[in-house]
Amino acid sequence: MDLVIMNFVFLLYLTSVVKCSIKLDFNKVSTPSKYTKRDALPMPLINDKILYTTELEIGSNKDKVSVSIDTGSYDLWVMSNDAVCYKVSEFQTEGAPQLPDIFNDIDQDYSCTFNGTYNSKSSKTFKNTSEDFSIGYVDGSAAQGVWGYDSVQFGQYGVTGLKIGIANRSSVSDGILGIGIANGYDNFPVLLQKQGLINKIAYSVYLNSSNSTTGTILFGAIDHAKYKGALSTVPVDSKSQLSVNVTNLKTKNGNVASGGHSILLDTGSTFSIFPDEWIDALGHSLNATYDEDESVYEIECDGYDEHFFGFSIGDSDFSVPIQDLKTEKDGQCYLAIMSNSVIGGGGILFGDDILRQIYLVYDLQDMTISVAPVVYTEDEDIEEILNPNEDQNEVPTSTSFTQSASSSGSQPSSTISGENMDKNTTSSSSGNCQTRSWIAILSALFLVYIHII
């Protein structure tokens, strides 16, 4: 995996329909990628990774900026047009842990402005808050700048008055569009609903298979073709992050953990984060060898067809192939799950490697998440998520659960220091839609970018 960096571009489209057929043609391009996260849960920098990003147009000049889509945070922040880019060793979060090499390359050379910048000074719709913006990540990367408000356009639609962090110094390669639980102000999903673009603050996520080049997110709607059985609805068990109770954690050879555990379901993370004992159980089930230098388990690169990591959420059972939980470096394969003891805190997280097996419906209004085993298909059966005041189920074809779980986690607090602060120097669409409702459904398609380094 050291040779390939994959970056999914998330292209947004808004339609005032329920049933749509949309054809998109994309160009395959090369792009550097270097990403970590965030403030809901400390995260590792993962050098060979998949990013889900959307191209936004910000301000009166419609500056084009690509930002990572993240259910684990709630802010939008982007690079300023005058941003200075640094290596992490030059501009970093103090006290960041030493991460295993297979997850981290803090001195990779890249441009933080590669994915576009925003010129707030030339935007006629920009409003300065005079607040300092600062964010630091567990891998050591950081960004600083100012907060402001401006309009954000996506396709032919947009929202106004969205709070934006504008970074003028950064050792992070990509800005972030957080679509998680709002905290203190109306973030992107809330404004979509308040400004009449969707009926309810809810969206569904379909990441598709690990070798696919496409996936979809629908704001305000569900695609029934993308899952099997019934959606199982469970409560979000945190006021600040989109985590749920997960049970029945197991492998082919036995249990990984007993009871229920609060786990963040985070599309903004390529890999998952487990406690040491869970990783040990997985490693032992594979007869893997622990690499003391890398602090990870060495595994075979193939031959695990019958092995899996299983778990349950509500009434739904899931099975993740072990092949989806590995990474490769210099011809050696590893079990690619980060230990939460390495990054500090007791938080547990399911990243994209696991979430590809789940069709997810995040309801930020009712604070629930609905899940079902995913079906990989190009078929569509899209239905809007109804207004809670209507006398119908808000999430169609679902069963509900109320469960308790043990939960532990940590919120990062970071200060930033700088040394050696020298400056580093299309798509098309077509389709037919049958109008059935005024309710707008915001949909998205992802395109994979492959970069050989």
UniProtKB/Swiss-Prot annotation:
Pepstatin A binds at D70, T71, G72, V138, D139, D266, T267, G268, S269, T270. InterPro entries: Aspartic_peptidase_A1, Aspartic_peptidase_AS, PEPTIDASE_A1, Peptidase_aspartic_dom_sf, SAP-like. One of its GO terms (biological process) is adhesion of symbiont to host. It is found in: Secreted; Cell membrane. Residues 430-453 form a propeptide. The active site is at D70, D266. Residues 1-20 form the signal peptide. Its EC number is 3.4.23.24. Glycans are attached at N115, N128, N168, N208, N211, N245, N287, N424. It catalyses: Preferential cleavage at the carboxyl of hydrophobic amino acids, but fails to cleave 15-Leu-|-Tyr-16, 16-Tyr-|-Leu-17 and 24-Phe-|-Phe-25 of insulin B chain. Activates trypsinogen, and degrades keratin. The keyword Secreted applies. GO terms for cellular component: cell surface; extracellular region; extracellular vesicle; fungal-type cell wall; plasma membrane; side of membrane. This is Secreted aspartic protease 10. It comes from Candida albicans (strain SC5314 / ATCC MYA-2876) (Yeast). The lineage of its organism: Eukaryota, Fungi, Dikarya, Ascomycota, Saccharomycotina. The gene is SAP10.
